[in-house]
Swiss-Prot record:
HAMAP family: RNA_methyltr_RlmN. One of its GO terms (biological process) is tRNA methylation. It comes from Nitratiruptor sp. (strain SB155-2). Keywords: 4Fe-4S, Cytoplasm, Disulfide bond, Iron, Iron-sulfur, Metal-binding, Methyltransferase, rRNA processing, S-adenosyl-L-methionine, Transferase, tRNA processing. The lineage of its organism: Bacteria, Pseudomonadati, Campylobacterota, Epsilonproteobacteria, Nautiliales. Its EC number is 2.1.1.192. Residues 105-338 form the Radical SAM core domain. One of its GO terms (cellular component) is cytoplasm. Its cofactor is [4Fe-4S] cluster. This is Dual-specificity RNA methyltransferase RlmN. Specifically methylates position 2 of adenine 2503 in 23S rRNA and position 2 of adenine 37 in tRNAs. m2A2503 modification seems to play a crucial role in the proofreading step occurring at the peptidyl transferase center and thus would serve to optimize ribosomal fidelity.
Amino acid sequence: MKNILDLTKEELQQEVTPKFRANQIYQWIYQKGAKDFESMSNLPKSMREELKEKFTITPPKILNVEVSKDGSKKYLLGLQDGHTVESVLLPMKKEERDEKGNILKEARYTVCVSSQVGCKVGCEFCLTAKGGFVRNLTPGEIVEQVLTIREDNNIPANRRVNIVYMGMGEPLDNLENVAKAVKIFSDEHGMSISPRRQTISTSGLAPKIKKLGEMNLGVLLAISLHAVDDELRQKLMPINKAYNIESVIQAVKEFPIDQRKRVMFEYLMIKNLNDDLKAAKKLVKLLHGIKAKVNLIYFNPYPGSPFQRPEPKDVEAFQKYLLDHGVLCTIRESKGLDISAACGQLKEKSHGCTL
């Protein structure tokens, strides 16, 4: 049987008649959290029986959760075939109430989702790569990560969250399923998470960046850059052999994006490797003419890693150079340092592996 969460609403409309029933089913699953068809009380009994015969609603199992002092939560989720993926809940702003208990400002969250079991790209600094590639996630398996985390944290269905495709896997290597997940998330009868609240991160698959742009999904784009010259980037990210920095930058320049938004460039700061002002100067030159935002990320060490976390003073100096030269730059607040929050850490930890 099919997992009904794999279907966009348009696909579901081909399965049920009349078509408006697809809207109701979406509302039951994505707004009311229904886990079975019998509870969908405004559907005819005959339709509920038919749905039970054709489809399943199969949420993943929560195998492990680690909670950080900063409120971040790292989830290890078990899929139906026994494989596991990781997802992370990142609280961005706390809820504020007045003395009467009325909500002044709603809490804001970002959910980091995985797109594959394992990864083909093989970045040297990423623990997920050590386990190799197993398979792509289905659209439903991507969507289920957010549903599961939302339910586990009692996040109201009408609370908008941001989604970043930055977990395990290379999203553009699973582009068709990721694109379907974007549509499912953004459907008005579902979670109504605007594409502008969804960021797809890529290691730099230049042709797929172009294809993503042609799909006109309206999502935000993030590029995992991490180096400013091909020699170093190739050592850190073998994908650079196929798609060098120049080809990635050209693909970014051609990518359609809302005029109010910017392309994010993620730059992992590694001590004594890419964290000096010489690299900052090259980065400014590289991004000339691009409406970009650079996100500096502290390397999150894992057992056996050959890399080290950079000094805060070096990261701050790097940021200052970029800002002084007209490049918008932020330092990502490190979250989950006490909970194995780097990709792949919780999975390896749960399996008792030492790397």
